[in-house]
Structures are given as C-alpha cells and as structure tokens.
Amino acid sequence: MAALLLSVTACAGPASQMETKPGTVVDHLEVIGADGTLLARTEVPRQTGWCLYWNHSVTGDGVIDCYVDDLGKMVLHRAYQPDFAAGLGHYPGRGILTSAEGGGYWIEDIDEPVRGNAYVLRVGSLAVNHRIVTDSDEINLSKMAEHTRVTIRLDTGE
C-alpha cells in the first residue's frame, strides 16, 4: 500500500511552463469501450497525474505506468518495473533508470507525450488486474472490461 501511495503522489511531474496554477483547471480521464460507450470518468486537475497498475501476465509481478496532465497534454512521466521480464525494460534515451527502494526499477523522467491524448489498452484478466489510480479515485478496468479493448483518454473539454 505504501508503494501505491508513493507512486500516485510521485507521478505528478512539473509542467514545462507554469501557465496554470496547479489544481485550478480540471480535466477528465475517460475510459471508453470499443463500442464508444463511456465506461468511467474521473477528474484530473492539471499538473497532477494518475497511474495504471497491473500484474505482469507472465511473472505476476506488479508494473506501474504513471502519467501527468501537463497543461492539458497526457504525458507518460515514469514507470515501475519489478524486473526486465517479457516486454519490459529500459531503452537508452527514454528516461533515467533508477533502482527502486525494495527492489525493481523506476524509469524516471520519461516525459513522453501521448499522441492525441489517448491510447488503446487490451484489458487483462482479473489476475492481471488493470486499474487506474488517481489521488481521489480507483477504476478497476479488469472488473469492468476484462479481455476487451478500451481507450484511455484525457478530455480537456477543448
């Protein structure tokens, strides 16, 4: 649980410019089903973030990707990986690899914008347990959309 709290509060990264006082503009993170149905929606104040948690489908170990609402742009800020199992790893030039307290690795300062403020995810089984965690909410994707395709989108109202 401490790792969960640490990673959620730590996923908020600095904006490249301070055009907006943190928390004064609120965007929404949406989960949209393959048929276009809105499955979930939660508030995300600008300059704050959220994390996508799941258990690796091969090893079962926890993996985390943390995003930031950087002035209305979805940005992948950091990622936690317990090891370099199938599909995991660090690529030179994409963030800074650091050892995590208690084991595993953080890839810090990835700061990679997500094209179109959205990405598609094939939600895993209940064992994979895909979930989005914000400072005030938790959306369990595996419970609502197991084995289906969803789009995770930052809605800025623009």
Positions of predicted regions on the chain:
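A generic structural signal for ordered alpha-helices
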Residues: 41, 45, 83, 110, ...
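N-terminal secretory signal peptides
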Residues: 25-82
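Sec-dependent N-terminal signal peptides
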Residues: 1-4
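Charge-biased, low-complexity intrinsically disordered regions
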Residues: 15-26
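Mature, soluble, non-transmembrane domains
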Residues: 50, 74-77, 88-158
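Short, surface-exposed beta-strand/loop "edge" segments at domain boundaries and coil↔beta transitions
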Residues: 36-41, 60-62, 84-86, 113-117, ...
